[in-house]
Amino acid sequence: MKKLLGILVLGLLWCNVGFADTLRVVDGDTIDLNGEKIRFSGIDAPESNYRGKEQTCLINETIIHCGKLSKEFLIKKIGTNKVTCKREKEPDQYKRILAECFVNGESLSKFLVRGGYAFAYRKYSKKFIEDEEFAKANKLGMWAMTFQYPWDFRKTS
């Protein structure tokens, strides 16, 4: 009986490890959750490492690493909370899952765009335009800086 109980306890511990979430923030609009690369659909954040280059912004003639800033803003928001994602489309051209992800029921995409640390990706979605307009009107995040849109940065890099 004790042996059976020991096996059962070990089995339960193994199950918990098997279902534990592993999360790594890749950049301001991409995470790796349980080994799956997930790209936040409908938004675009500054690049922290695109072909070996990091996107920068200017504020009062000071260079700001806005790619890293966006990533850090996302890391801080997630903290130790559980991230859940709702798949929206087929994987993109880079084989990333496209999804909207949430922490405590709050959209991380909306949080990033409304805070000025990502942009509504109008080419693919109209969902976050109002949030971008709010950030722009209030000069939040990158809207307080001189910046290049991420899609333009990628074209010139």
Q: Which positions does each model-derived feature cover?
A:
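Small beta-barrel nucleic-acid-binding modules, primarily SNase/OB-fold domains
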Residues: 4-157
